[in-house]
A protein has these predicted regions:
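Interdomain "pre-motor" coupling segment immediately N-terminal to P-loop NTPase/helicase cores
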Residues: 201-259
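N-terminal accessory regions of nucleic-acid-interacting proteins
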Residues: 1-21
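Conserved DEDDh/DEDDy metal-dependent 3′-5′ exonuclease domain
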Residues: 41-142
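Acidic, Mg2+-coordinating catalytic module of metal-dependent nucleases/exonucleases
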Residues: 110-202, 212
Length: 1001
């Protein structure tokens, strides 16, 4: 890492205040098995050094030293070296000092941890020299601090063993501050609340306060408290929150400016005031409660603007303390919409991680969470069982969970979801990991005001996390909506009435239907009749779904035909008509769906139901299909009891087959997991984190013929039966890879499903896949898929040329000191005058990409205007080189995709082509073509180029290819094999289904 100390090998001149003869720099290597010293290293500033396992010789080398200095020696080395060195030398530890004096550095390990000098790994002399170099830098950094801050740190930390040696070594004066709070206020009055309990924190949490002050003084927007500090001083984040995000009742200047929600609303979103409902300031109340650290349950009317009430506090808190807010949402489309809406406002601090993302997008989103770039993370409740999500959140400080559609907790709600019941367990895991009595606040949002649902939500968090939810509710009515029920005789009459409504509509319309098939059929019929419409459903092709949604929101298409997966969080205020082609499954769903009309309260909108008595039968049939019966759960319980281990990993398919259940593939996963949830609620089992395994990420052959040749040439497959079995497995994988998205469903590469479909035992499938890797048929080359338009590929050069010209224009603006302030419209006019096919959206797309790629350090857009401020620490030469490399890579990738589109089997009459390719192979091909290029190109550069092509619309990245096993981790709690799952255990689910029937009625 560039910001780590350089290696010092010769004589070193320490600051004049330090006697060079009094300090030795040391490091010890200790066997973790025996706890005995196996190697020692030491050096002195005059150039003398020691490297041996001889303890007596080491003691002699250190003789006469008043101080021994090393990295992490107080917590580690000294417990082994104190018996050797005696009580004489005082330790000086560079690790806690590094975190205090270089708070912007994320990591504080020595260079060996970066694996850059492999020949020096575990070399204690090398580490001692690095500690000496780091100590020099720390002394220099300390001397650059204002004198009053030096003395303040000394006063707070001089009695702590990890810091005492440093201050004594530097002979820092140790004043006794009668009023440390006053000193801090004078230093940082504009950066923290002057009414915070500074005196109390200085007494109770001196180290944490020191780290917090250092961070506040030095940090920039993307910085986070170093993980080492959070691990070893876990209360630091709480101290930071107390200083910077706890509004005082007295209203100090800092709190008035930085913690006032109305000021924040204007600064982040450009609004002067919050919305009210029947003169109730519900939005403002919810935002203030969150800023005040309260847990809450807010009942908002559909279209009531709830998003801003949790986005605003999250953005304010993230800016001031780098805390992360996690938003749990059941719909992937909602997450995408909300993140894109924030991006369109110039807010780049929100990301989502969901199944619609390509592997590159997912990887970048995780990076943004870990690095501190993101302050808002949107995920689905099922993602909480992902170990990678847990690991990412453990590296940040989550201070609030926002639960959207909170009625999903309750069996009395219209959309009970078992995945919601794991939320409290996950929050508890994080709290336990953070330690220091860390409490994570919760904000729940729902549109249902059913008292039983509200009680269930409050009871859940009270019983599971000890949280009291403040209830905020309004009885506001949507006065700009009118409702009609239109009776229809048959399907022909239904369609005719729909056409009449659409022809008379004064603006955009949403038509809700019951099934995915109906969305496509009805949209096609309307378009054929001259009423252009697009389809939208949760299980549609991701590219088509996204394109259709974008076209409707942008006003390019007037009508969208959708299932109820569409609409939540969609920022379209001018919808004038919502038609339920079929009745909704519940009154709550109907209120929510119809409420997507007329979000602009100045517009009148219609909500119509086309109703026939037979419609009810359709809903009852769907309910019967999805119902989980008592007998189903009993069979799943019997299957679990048949497993010998108390704790084990098993996939939903394996468990269903073991139970003798033949579910439809689309329902199997949900039904099995619901059955496990029922058993967990009743205390029979405990389900914890998922246990996935990935066996390969690419197929290294282009055809089954090539695969057979490699298999037959390999000695790993001894018999003809083994070879045939291997060919069958590879053929399925190749078919799955090449068929990705062509059938509107994901590639089937799960090992348990492969075993089931091919009639081969799962252990045998896994064994064959291992041999296929050894034979070079399967690799880890990151196969991925993309949908491209032949038309778009032809015009790609022009599109990329436009972006290249825009980037050149931006770089010229940034050349003066790495900062630029400009107006988007004016910049666009300048680009147009220069002959570029520019528009403001393209400029915004480019800016957001450059920010995400790390080429821009800061980007601020004045809310409600087109004014933008940019800051970069890159030189003009670096920016130009990065732009040129990306342009070359993009051009190469486009030509490669053109060749694939022309040569591939998918080259039919359709404009859209589904392609599979490997990012690693693209890198190899590019390096082979560009072997004379001086600048080395990495896999990340290729991924960045693919991401750029995706964001500029040249291609649409889809999911990756993985041969995997998706296991659930289960543990039996009830160990009595005679115990049966009983009717009284099923009561909660029985009530849920009774409620569903009642809701249809």
């Amino acid at each position: 890492m560039s910001n780590l100390p350089t290696l010092a090998t010769g004589p070193v001149q320490l600051p004049g205040t330090i006697n060079q003869d009094t300090i030795v720099f040391i490091d010890a290597e200790v066997s973790p098995e025996t706890g005995k010293i196996v190697d020692l290293g030491a050096c002195r500033p005059d150039g003398r050094f020691f490297h041996s396992s001889n303890v007596a010789a080491f003691k002699e080398f250190c003789k006469g030293a008043e101080y021994v200095c090393g990295h992490n020696i107080v917590a580690f080395d000294m417990q082994y070296l104190r018996p050797v060195l005696g009580d004489g030398p005082q330790p000086v530890d560079t690790l806690p000092l590094s975190a205090l004096l270089f708070p912007r550095k994320r990591f504080h390990k020595l260079l060996k941890d970066e694996k850059l000098l492999t020949d020096e790994l575990n070399n204690p002399l090398s580490d001692a020299r690095k500690a000496m170099a780091l100590f020099e830098e720390e002394v220099a950094a300390f001397n650059e601090l204002p004198g009053v801050l030096q003395r303040l740190f000394c006063a707070m930390l001089k009695n702590r063993p990890e810091f005492a040696g440093f201050f004594r070594c530097l002979n820092v004066q140790t004043p006794t501050f009668a009023d440390p709070a006053g000193v801090i206020k004078r230093l940082m009055a504009d950066r923290l609340c002057i009414h915070a309990d500074l005196d109390g924190l200085a007494k109770r949490r001196p180290a944490e306060l020191a780290y917090a002050l250092a961070f506040i003084r030095a940090a920039e927007p993307a910085d986070v408290i170093p993980p080492w500090v959070n691990t070893n001083y876990p209360a630091t984040q709480a101290v930071l929150e107390a200083l910077r995000f706890t509004p005082c009742s007295k209203g100090c200047p800092y709190c008035k400016e930085r913690l006032d929600v109305k000021t924040g609303l204007s600064r982040f979103f450009g609004f002067d005031s919050f919305r009210t409902y029947n003169d109730e300031p519900l939005q403002e109340m919810a935002a203030r409660a969150a800023v005040g650290g309260e847990s809450l349950l807010a009942v908002f009317p559909t279209g009531g603007g709830k998003s801003i009430t949790f986005q605003l506090p999250a953005l304010m808190q993230g800016e001031l303390t780098r805390a992360l807010t996690v938003v749990i949402s059941p719909l992937q489309s909602l997450m995408k919409d909300q993140v894109e809406n924030l991006v369109s406002k110039g807010i780049s601090r929100a990301v989502t991680i969901n199944g619609l993302l390509s592997p590159i997008e997912r990887s970048r989103a995780l990076e943004a969470v870990i690095s501190g770039e993101a302050t808002l993370l949107y995920i689905a409740p099922e993602s909480l069982r992902s170990r990678s999500i847990l690991a990412a959140l453990q590296q940040r400080r989550v201070t609030r969970f926002v639960i959207d559609e909170a009625h999903c907790f309750s069996v009395w709600g219209h959309d009970f979801r078992v995945d919601y019941l794991f939320i409290a367990d996950f929050i508890k895991k994080l709290e336990d990991f953070y330690g220091a009595n860390s409490k994570i606040a919760v904000s729940c949002f729902t549109a249902t005001a059913k008292q039983k649902v509200i009680q269930d939500i409050c009871d859940y968090f009270k019983q599971r996390l000890g949280l009291e939810l403040r209830i905020l509710a309004t009885s506001a009515e949507r006065k700009n909506l009118s409702y009609r029920v239109i009776h229809v005789e048959n399907d022909a009459d239904r369609y005719a009435r729909l056409r009449e409504l659409l022809e008379a509509a004064e603006g955009p319309a949403i038509v809700y239907v019951a099934t995915v098939r109906e969305t496509k059929e009805l949209a096609a019929a309307l378009t054929a009749d001259g009423l252009e419409a697009v389809a939208f459903a949760g299980r549609m092709d991701a590219t088509e779904k996204s394109a259709n949604q974008d076209a409707f929101i942008a006003g390019q298409v007037k009508t969208i035909v959708a299932t109820n997966a569409f609409g939540m969080g969609v920022d379209k205020k001018d919808v004038r008509l919502v038609v339920h082609y079929n009745i909704s499954s519940s009154l709550e769903n109907y209120v929510q769906e119809s409420g997507r009309a007329g979000r602009d309260e100045s517009l009148q909108a219609q909500c119509c139901i086309l109703f026939n008595e037979e419609d009810l039968n359709t809903h009852f049939a769907l309910l019967r299909q999805s119902k989980l019966t008592l007998a189903d759960i009993q069979l799943i319980w019997n299957a679990i009891k048949s497993v010998k281990s108390r704790r084990f990993s098993i996939s939903p398919l394996e468990l269903a087959r073991k139970a003798g259940l033949e579910y439809d593939e689309l329902q199997l996963d949900t039904k099995v997991k619901n059955a496990i949830a029922a058993l967990e609620i009743a205390g029979y089992v405990r389900r914890s984190m998922n246990a996935p395994r990935v066996y390969a990420t690419s197929v290294a052959v282009k055809s089954t013929i090539e695969a057979r040749e490699r298999i037959e040439a390999s000695p790993l497959f001894a018999t003809e039966a083994e070879r045939n079995e291997a060919v069958r497995i590879v053929a399925s994988l190749i078919s799955a890879r090449s068929g990705y998205k062509t059938k509107g469903e994901p590639a089937e590469t799960r090992t348990d499903w492969l075993a089931d479909r091919l009639g081969i035992a799962l252990p045998q499938v896994v064994a064959v896949i291992g041999k296929l890797r050894q034979a070079g048929v399967l690799h880890d080359d990151n196969d991925m898929s993309a949908t491209v338009s032949r038309r778009q590929l032809k015009s790609a050069s022009a599109v990329l040329g436009t972006y290249q010209n825009l980037e050149s224009l931006l770089i010229r603006r940034l050349s003066d000191g790495g900062r630029a302030d400009f107006n988007l419209k004016e910049l666009n006019n300048e680009a147009l005058a220069g002959g570029s096919a520019s528009d403001v959206k393209k400029i915004t797309t480019l800016l957001m990409y450059l920010k995400a790629a790390g080429l821009l350090d800061e980007m601020r857009r004045t809310r409600g205007s087109q004014n933008v401020s940019l800051v970069t620490k890159r030189s003009t030469q670096e920016l130009e080189a990065a732009a040129q490399m990306r342009a070359d890579l993009c051009a190469f990738i486009v030509e490669s995709l053109k060749a694939m589109a022309q040569n591939g089997a998918s080259a039919g009459s359709s404009d859209y082509v589904a392609l599979s390719f490997s990012a690693v192979q693209l890198l190899r091909d590019y390096r082979q073509q560009s072997w004379l290029t001086e600048t080395p190109v990495t896999l990340r550069d290729v991924e960045n180029a693919l991401l750029f092509l995706h964001r500029t619309g040249v291609l649409s990245l889809e999911g990756g290819f993985m041969v995997s096993y998706q296991g659930m981790t289960l543990e039996r709690v009830e160990l009595d094999n005679k115990r049966r799952y009983r009717k009284q255990d099923y009561a909660q689910f029985s009530e849920h289904y009774r409620q569903k029937v009642q809701q249809v009625h």
